[in-house]
From Swiss-Prot:
EC top class, as a word: transferase
Matches recorded under HAMAP family: TrmD
GO biological process: tRNA N1-guanine methylation
Pfam family, one: tRNA_m1G_MT
Residues that bind S-adenosyl-L-methionine: 108, 127-132
Gene that this sequence comes from: trmD
The protein's name in its UniProt record: tRNA (guanine-N(1)-)-methyltransferase
Length: 245
């Protein structure tokens, strides 16, 4: 996979050069191409913004240097722009993007874009209902979520299958040694060696965590009869705990 990023601050993307993603680049599993669109400005001092037509506070990033930077790319693929008005990024989008050969992200900073910049993009995407100083951090988050799904990036392919959101549920609790830490014990079922019981416990706990923290995910889910039974049991267990109080 080849990922292009148009940005005024390419140095911000250093974190993508380390850990699993950095190793993935070294192994040739993906490539990051950082393009400073300031280099495509033909104005004095390489300026890339100007005052808005019609007046108003602040400055607006110009379309020409960004368009010229895009045109310089050999393989653009899907063009994505980070914007508060975009649809919210999620795991399904990461999975879809991970199947692309080329992706291009456009990052703003401080100012908004000339409206014609948005017309250059195939998708407008946000990471949440809040405002940041630029699009670099959202872009890094989306790149991380996408690239980690590529074959060979994670050591264990099952890791991407069993973790939160991959099947529409939050992840079940996990434990490692010691089995007893200051009186806090690992659930006995995980020590039993009975993989059928362990799978059932994990499914139950994933449903329980999702019901508690992200009930909206359950509303979108086509529940199996077994999940309906488990959720009924979860409600009964919760009621029993309340009755003890």
């Amino acid at each position: 996979m080849n990922i292009n990023v148009l940005t005024l601050f390419p140095e911000m993307f250093t974190p993508l050069q380390v850990s699993l993603l950095g190793r993935g680049q070294e192994d040739g599993k993906w490539k990051l191409n950082l393009v400073n669109f300031r280099d495509f400005s033909d104005r004095p001092h390489k300026s890339v913004d100007d005052t808005p037509y019609g007046g108003g506070a602040g400055m607006v990033l110009q379309v020409k240097p960004i368009k010229d930077a895009l045109d310089s790319l050999e393989n653009k693929g899907k063009v994505i722009i980070t914007a508060p008005q975009g649809k919210t990024f999620n795991e399904q989008m990461a999975q879809e993007w991970s199947k692309e050969e080329n992706l291009t992200f456009i990052c703003g900073h401080f100012e908004g874009f000339d409206q014609r910049v948005y017309d250059l993009a195939d998708e407008m995407v946000s990471i949440g209902d809040y405002v940041l100083t630029g699009g670099e951090l959202p872009t890094m988050s989306m790149i991380d979520a996408t690239v980690r799904l590529l074959p060979g990036i994670l050591g264990n392919a099952l890791s991407t299958v069993e973790e939160s959101f991959s099947d529409g549920l939050l992840e079940y609790p996990q434990y490692t040694r010691p089995a007893d830490f200051e009186g806090q014990k690992v659930p006995e079922v995980l020590l039993s060696g009975n993989h059928g019981k362990i799978d059932e416990w994990r499914h139950y706990q994933a449903l329980k965590a999702t019901k508690l923290h992200r009930p909206d995910l359950l509303e979108k889910r086509d529940l199996t009869p077994e999940e309906v039974r488990m959720l009924r049991q979860i409600r009964e267990d919760e009621q029993a705990e309340e009755d003890k109080l």
